[in-house]
A protein has these predicted regions:
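Short, charged, solvent-exposed linker or helix-capping segments at domain edges/interfaces
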Residues: 95-100
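Flexible, low-complexity linker/hinge segments
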Residues: 101-113
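Non-catalytic interaction-recognition regions
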Residues: 1-94, 112-606
Length: 606
């Protein structure tokens, strides 16, 4: 049993025995003792004063005496203005370390048949361009959130919805037909998603040229600049051709459908390479080309049930004014669907495929209103998780030189970013890696991959997802400070210490004796290790990968300070050496498990 649980149970018993009243567990408030006071944990007595009918100091004294006598975890206590500072017994610390040591998955809850099923949607790419920096943040958040939810005892299904239809897809298709000359990814020596992205940019270039000429013509005919611009954007031959192609696609034109399938397959192959490089994946992928018709059918069912209204122009709307919102378009007057319709269709397919208890959408904060509306609509349509769906909303990510726009071809490409991070990691870690005995070029490359990706992932995930962030590649690959490489290097350092101990024929016991020597820094490290279970649980409640990232940094920082102050292999006594090796071993274990929740690998040496 954890120290906090022992003390909480004993404190509840103390209140009942001393004051004749049972109080709820939430009344026992424990916190870490301030560094300027003696003790390890502090019990706040103020919530108990109505029960004790005594002054805070007297209440603290009563409970302190009871705990010292009746709770093995408490060795001593002192009272400061109603705060009961508890000194934890030596045996409790070693017992706690033994519990942590015995559990390879310490801090995580097991998944059982009865566990709730959580589905997490992330990535959601368009098939007209490669993945970019914004997708990187999305994918890393989604993957990490899935690991965190599973570590909290949930069954998790990772899912992706691919936006594979619509006018933007037709733009790339039309550009390929006009200017592609039959080019393929193989002929171009390019990933398919990059090739299709080039044609999307090419369409935009020619479209702007057409608009510019038409706008000039309309202005000469007497229109204002704004009127001329708007008309040009609707009347440009290219956009009309793209709309005609979309109509043909929706009417299942075999030639257009064949082209669409071929080009989309090129893109999917490219996406798969990027996902593999990032270390993310999915259990189930949905495609909007399959879900939008399901959504239309679901909306029409809702219309029949009186949930929605049809206006005079034949469009279908949801009236949300009773929720303090406006009316929301669900079907256009020509019967075509909008994004909301597609999301309803996707929800219907998922609901039929899996008995979902909770649905989490990892989507940027520009869609906050969309998901507020979707939640209401799904609830009205009878999805049990609709009202409580979670929109895991995150902010924009930028590089120091500004925002990204894929139409202009200035997008920060995910593949290029990953490749450059690995190259930079290899350069910056060269001095450290070259000192390793018997290191091969293959091992050097693998260490560079682990460190480069670790730097990228950690830098992005350590930031509160709700905030906009600036990703600085140079700052991320630093072996000091709050970075992935700093944590990875500390892990590798501990593994090196443990290998040296093994080479010296030092065998660690499965558990320490109650009287194993422990100084205050060692107790603090054991407490920090114990905090991992709290960090995991809180990250599950808050949907917060940054909570795990910052815990890993705090643990690493605390261990490095300890390692600076105390020798491990050259400790004064054999008992101290064994204790410190046991602590170091478990710090490495928790670092590895914590970083795994972020999707980050740690190298055994570097």
């Amino acid at each position: 049993m954890k120290i906090e649980e022992q003390i909480t149970g004993a404190a509840l018993a103390a209140v009942k025995e001393l004051y004749g009243t049972e109080v709820p567990e939430k009344m026992i408030q424990l916190q870490k003792t301030r560094s300027d006071f003696e003790g390890n944990l502090t019990l706040v007595t103020f919530p108990l004063l109505k029960t004790s009918h005594k002054k805070p100091e007297d209440t603290a004294q009563d409970i302190g005496e009871y705990l010292k006598k009746n709770c093995k975890a408490v060795a001593d206590f002192n009272v400061v203005k109603g705060f009961l500072n508890l000194v934890i017994a030596q045996a409790a610390w070693t017992g706690l370390l033994n519990d942590i040591n015995a559990d390879e998955k310490f801090g995580e809850k097991p998944v059982t048949e009865e566990s709730p099923l959580v589905m997490i949607e992330y990535s959601s790419p368009n098939t007209n361009k490669p993945l970019h920096l914004g997708h990187v943040r999305n994918n890393l958040l989604g993957w990490s959130l899935a690991q965190i939810m599973e570590a909290n005892g949930n069954k998790v299904i990772k899912t992706n919805i691919v936006n594979d239809r619509g006018i933007h897809i037709c733009k790339s298709m039309l550009a390929w037909l006009k200017w592609g000359n039959g080019i393929t990814p193989e002929k171009a020596g390019k990933k398919g998603d990059h090739l299709i992205g080039d044609f999307y940019v090419l369409f935009d270039k020619h479209f702007k040229e057409e608009c510019k000429q038409l706008q000039k013509q309309y202005e000469e005919e007497g229109m204002t600049a704004d009127e001329a611009k708007e008309k040009a954007e609707h009347e440009a031959p290219l956009i009309k051709e793209a709309h005609d192609m979309l109509v043909k696609w929706e009417n299942n034109d075999p030639e257009i459908r064949g082209l669409w399938e071929m080009m989309n397959n090129w893109v999917y192959a490219g996406f798969d390479e990027t996902y593999k490089a990032l270390g993310v994946g999915f259990d189930k992928i949905y495609y909007e080309s399959n879900t939008y018709l399901v959504g239309k059918k679901k909306v029409e069912e809702g219309l029949t049930k009186g949930l929605f209204i049809r206006k005079d122009d034949n469009s279908v709307w949801a009236d949300l004014t009773d929720e303090g919102l406006d009316q929301k378009l669900l079907l256009r007057k020509d019967g075509t669907s909008v994004y909301m319709t597609q999301d309803i269709g996707t929800a219907e397919m998922r609901f039929n495929d899996f008995p979902i208890d909770k649905m989490i959408y990892v989507v940027g904060n520009e869609q906050n209103y969309h998901f507020q509306v979707l939640s209401i609509l799904l609830d009205r349509l009878g999805f049990k998780w609709g009202k409580d769906l979670v929109h895991f909303s995150y902010g924009m990510v930028e590089l120091p030189n500004g925002k990204m726009k894929s139409r202009e071809g200035t997008v920060v490409d995910a593949d290029d970013l990953v490749a450059s991070m690995i190259v930079n990691a290899k350069t910056l870690s060269e001095d450290k890696v070259n000192k390793l005995e018997g290191i091969t070029e293959e091992e050097k490359d693998e260490i560079a991959r682990i460190v480069g990706l670790g730097a990228l992932k950690y830098f992005i995930l350590k930031v509160d997802a709700r905030k906009n962030m600036l990703f600085n590649p140079e700052e991320s690959i630093d072996f000091n400070g709050n970075t992935g490489p700093f944590i990875q290097y500390t892990y590798a350092r501990i593994r090196s210490i443990l290998r040296k101990a093994e080479a010296q024929n030092i065998t660690l016991p499965t558990s320490l004796s109650d009287d194993a020597p422990l100084n205050e820094k060692e107790k603090a490290l054991i407490q920090k290790l114990n905090d991992f279970s709290v960090a995991v649980a809180q990250a599950g409640v808050d949907y917060s990968p940054s909570g795990i990232a910052n815990y890993c940094y705090e643990l690493t920082k605390e261990f490095n300070q300890f390692y600076h102050d105390y020798s491990i292999l050259n400790a004064d006594t054999e008992a101290e050496r064994i204790t410190r090796l046991m602590i170091a071993k478990n710090v490495a274990k928790v670092i590895k498990n914590g970083m795994a929740l972020l999707g980050i690998e740690v190298p055994e040496r570097m």
